[in-house]
Amino acid sequence: MSRTEASGWGFSLLQILLVLAGMVWKAREGFPIVDFLDTSGDTCSWLNPCIVPPALSCWNNWPWFALHLFLYTTQLVGLSAIILPPVYLIRMLGLSTALPLISLWVLHRRRRTGKGWATTFPPRHGEEAFLWRVLWFTGLAHVASFLVATAASFLGREDMAPWHLTNTLLGTPDCSYLPCSQIAERQARLRQINEMTGTSSGFFLAVALFSQHLEMNGARLGAGLLARLFFVSLIAGPAAGAADALLLRSAFMRTRRST
């Protein structure tokens, strides 16, 4: 097995682990693995109404869920703009399961079609400028969300409780005793599952594409570069980390063409 194939299987194993983590997490929280649209109101598809909650629920509960909804939506929009194809699989399985499965399809496309990973998402005109916009937009949104939640946590006032880290970005509020809707709490829990597993999958897919392209050209993804990508993802969010990985891939391709 070549180094490129070994790396591909390693990233594939990571995507499988993310699939299993998302499915187990959803099952433990009482969510169906397959999200057939349910209009009963006590459960929800990951896409609707979890991203666009019903107007009344949003109006009554917005202080408790607005910050995480903003963070999740900006990350999802960024990843969708970069790598997420509009297939029905996403709608049925949810981001936490479908994106790792799509990532597996992308990573093994070469074995089925003979096309390299670099051709899966070939550079397009204006791609770098677009990726820079995604990186800055999603990165600033991610940092701003954590700054707001951190400030609310340090202030410690009761009126700031809806913005506290434990009620927004590190967890969801316990609406069994807090003044918020338990239906909205379940929607927030599903968004949290999708964020932790689905958006992580998108980031690792972008890193895998960059790594495979390097190895196909006789280079490799070193520890320093990998640490830089993780640092960007940790601080600026997985969408910004994915954009950064694809920007590095474009820079490497441009350098190869000029030499």
UniProtKB/Swiss-Prot annotation:
The keyword Disulfide bond does not apply. It is found in: Membrane. Its main location: membrane. One of its GO terms (cellular component) is membrane. It comes from the Eukaryota. The keyword Membrane applies. Keywords: Membrane, Transmembrane, Transmembrane helix. It is a multi-pass membrane protein. The chain crosses the membrane at residues 5-25, 64-84, 87-107, 134-154, 221-241. Coiled coil: none annotated. Belongs to the ltmS family. Part of the gene cluster that mediates the biosynthesis of paspalitrems, indole-diterpene (IDT) mycotoxins that are potent tremorgens in mammals. The geranylgeranyl diphosphate (GGPP) synthase idtG is proposed to catalyze the first step in IDT biosynthesis via catalysis of a series of iterative condensations of isopentenyl diphosphate (IPP) with dimethylallyl diphosphate (DMAPP), geranyl diphosphate (GPP), and farnesyl diphosphate (FPP), to form GGPP. Condensation of indole-3-glycerol phosphate with GGPP by the prenyltransferase idtC then forms 3-geranylgeranylindole (3-GGI). This is Indole-diterpene biosynthesis cluster protein S. The gene is idtS.
